Amino acid sequence: MFAKIQSYKPALDLLNQVDADVITFETRSSGALDLEAIGRQITEKKVGIGVIDHHTLQVESPEEVAGDIRAALRHVPAERLILCSDCGMGREGMSRRHAYYKMVSLVLGTNLVRKELGLPQADCLAADPKFSLIRTT
């Protein structure tokens, strides 16, 4: 349905030379294809790693997001790692509700890893059942 996934490897040396503080990569939709190479070659910049796929309406579970974060931490130091979506959520057919739940999963997945690392967790009122958009009673 989508074009063949392209490797970032041929561009990494040039991206490392770009006058920017952060370089972002679509890694969720590629199955983390180049994550090891990104961590090895992008050494002086912060690295944004996509842990949410904008190509699909399927909402990632917090556990899936946490798995992607753990994989990223094997290659990119935590102090240079930024977690993000692969791209914006403006694709045709992506409702605000889908984007909302995808971002909630990003926060909850991040909190799973932060807890494992003994770091403080971020409040996520959107995941609190009392603020749910879905009627439960």
Feature-to-residue mapping (PLM):
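Domain-level signal for soluble alpha/beta catalytic cores
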Residues: 1-137
